[in-house]
Design a protein with these regions (language model features):
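ADP-ribose/adenylate-binding Rossmann-like module
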Residues: 84-117, 254-312
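A structured beta-alpha segment of the ubiquitous adenosine-cofactor-binding alpha/beta core
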Residues: 54-65, 75-76, 223-255, 259-276, ...
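Short glycine-/small-residue-rich Rossmann-like dinucleotide-binding loops
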Residues: 68, 74-75, 94-95, 216, ...
Length: 373
């Protein structure tokens, strides 16, 4: 059983899908591991460390030769997979909705493409969930990015020269990224408030010492929502939420938006008029900018200023913490493959629940129901 870890080729992608730690663990399972030379360089993992952990290093073609499983962070370009074995697995973040044509090309190659972001939100799959591990770091980094752009301090400071007021931070969307953003902003000494469409998040917000800001008179999503995700809301709810947000946002110094809907463009949470209502020098960080953005006027890959307010739209935020993001992503992949490792067969054998959820292609066809529906 040969496992290949590729060097990422997407612009700005610094993460890597295997680390010396996970290579060592795969070797202990009985697998052969091949790592493309330089794969971990941008994340501070040297080729020598991979070799010491038991991996062989080589060119992409050498690494792919006879590989049974190909690991990636982002889905590799099908044209960059020379000589890929029929039936080989490709396990990575494949962006199936955004890169639907690429999924079809994986099928044409005869590959079995496994989209790690389709991992079901169930207890036994938590350690395999790349969305959670990467979103957690993104939420942390969003607060640091906001602090770097904000021309004032976060905590209240009482000095001989007078008092510095604490920054007011508002987090919109309380998933994994939002919860970490709340916790990080609180650690930095900010006054934090947060909102979400899911009723169950109210007590999570309170547990972190932040103030919940919720629409009270129109029903949102009870509980956690489908699989822990938000869905599209009614027009009535959207109008009530916009009114509530408008009155609250004008008093905030920092706003961090994290709202995503799987398979759909990101919901618009902040209008240009709401941006204009904020104080000059305020900062908004839009973590959903690559999916269309929560903030009107946000530009992917740029920090823009509108009405005196900075709108931060960094791409691929987890990659900006490449070492930790890689370590967690690589562990997610190892936890996934090792959980299904059949010692007698010497390879992983997926069960139906998780296999059917993440498998996009098999036998030359696209087979995932979410893509066929």
């Amino acid at each position: 059983m040969k496992i290949a870890a590729l060097k990422e080729t997407a612009a700005g992608e610094r993460r890597v899908s295997a680390t010396p730690e996970t290579v060592k663990k795969f070797v202990a399972l009985g697998a052969t591991v091949a790592v493309e030379a330089g794969a971990g360089e941008a994340a501070s993992f040297a080729d020598a460390d991979y070799a010491q952990a038991g991996a062989t290093l080589g060119s992409r073609a050498e690494v792919l030769a006879d590989a049974d499983i190909v690991l990636g962070v982002q889905g590799p370009d099908p044209d960059s997979l020379p000589g890929l074995k029929q039936g080989a697995w490709i396990a990575a973040s494949l962006n199936p909705f955004g890169e639907r044509a690429r999924v079809g090309r994986y099928a044409a190659l005869g590959a079995e493409a496994l989209a790690m972001e389709f991992m079901p939100r169930i207890t036994r799959a938590q350690s395999m969930d790349i969305l959670s591990s990467q979103s957690n770091l993104a939420g942390y980094k969003a607060v640091l990015d906001a602090a770097a752009e904000y021309d004032r301090a976060f905590p209240m400071m009482m000095t001989a020269a007078g008092t510095v007021s604490a920054a007011k931070v508002f987090v919109m969307g309380v998933g994994v990224a939002g919860l970490q953003a709340i916790a990080t902003a609180r650690r930095l000494g900010a006054q934090v408030s947060a909102t979400d469409v899911r009723a169950a998040t109210k007590e999570q917000i309170l547990s972190l010492g932040a103030k919940p800001i919720f629409v009270e008179n129109v029903q949102g999503i009870e509980g956690e929502g489908t699989g822990g995700y938000a869905t599209e809301m009614s027009d009535e709810y959207k109008a009530a939420q916009a009114e509530l947000v408008s009155s609250h946002i004008a008093k905030q110094d920092i706003v961090i938006t994290t709202a995503l809907i799987p398979g759909r463009p990101a919901p618009r949470l902040i209008s240009d008029a709401q941006v204009a209502s904020m104080k000059p020098g305020s900062v908004i960080v839009d973590l959903a900018v690559e999916q269309g953005g929560n903030v009107e006027g946000a530009v992917a890959g740029e920090v823009v200023t509108r009405h005196g307010v900075k709108i931060v739209g960094h791409r691929n935020v987890p990659s900006r913490l490449a070492a930790d993001a890689s370590a967690l992503f690589a562990r997610n992949l190892f936890n996934f493959l090792s959980a299904f490792w059949d010692k007698e067969a010497g390879k992983p054998v997926l069960d139906d629940e998780i296999g059917n959820a993440i498998r996009l292609t098999q036998g030359g066809k696209v087979v995932n129901e979410r893509l066929l529906g």
